[in-house]
Amino acid sequence: MLEKAKIDRINELSKKKKAGTLTSAEKVEQDKLRKEYIKSFRTHMKGTIENTTIIDPNGKDVTPHKVKQLRKNKY
């Protein structure tokens, strides 16, 4: 995941934006940090989904076919 310092900076810039004191340089920095955060989030979420197996109450594997295919293509 993204470093805590970067997440803190995203939050700090967000507060400045709400207050109306965000400079154009900070706006560029905010956009860059947000894109980096979203990329990191998506990568981790994809990994979580690929490693999840869904079992129904009868014990049958009901993991969606698309997830199984992602898993196969990964290895």
From Swiss-Prot:
Alphabetized UniProt keyword annotations: Cytoplasm
Q: Which InterPro entries match?
A: DUF896 (IPR009242)
Primary location class:
cytoplasm
- Positions of the region Disordered? 56-75
Subcellular localization, as worded in the UniProt entry: Cytoplasm
HAMAP family registered for this protein in UniProt: UPF0291
Instruction: Report the PANTHER family cross-referenced here.
Output: UPF0291 PROTEIN CBO2609/CLC_2481, UPF0291 PROTEIN YNZC
* Protein's recorded name: UPF0291 protein lmo1304
